Amino acid sequence: MTTIAARTIVTARLDLLPLRVEHATEMARVLSDPALHAFTGGAPDTPEELRSRYERMTGGSPDPAVSWLNWVIRLRDEDRLAGTVQATVSPSGGGLTAEIAWVVGTAWQGRGIATEAAQGLAGWLGQQPVQALVAHIHPDHKASAAVAAAAGLSPTDEWQDGEVRWERRLTAR
């Protein structure tokens, strides 16, 4: 069994910092726009709800074969948080697959932040013992599809819960 731990990932403009409970207050503001839930459903979390969620997330998966990896996206020049990226790494077909996702606050969208963060995450995961990346994207979410494509993922014919499965095979490490 391979367990992977989140480490800081540095890109040209961003620091992807391993998630800490202390990020909840600032992230609640970043993620406060209800429009962020247009494709996923739900509503923005309060700081207290987000703190509780982050406590669960940083506690790790109850399944020792699964690694929960979560980062906040920090804009280095502005020294502020702008979103999150995550990877759930689990055994699949004799190897490890990372299910990845990203979200960038409305105020920071349209600046290539999600693309840069997803590319940084994909590059880092490619240095881990992960054989494949997977993302599930709503078919109408064109911006998220563009991020997935920029991170090297391609859409498949598979669907899950109304979303298209995107995949990228990695060179085994």
Which residues does each predicted region cover?
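Conserved G/P- and acidic residue-centered "switch" motifs that form tight phosphate/ATP-binding loops
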Residues: 79, 112, 141
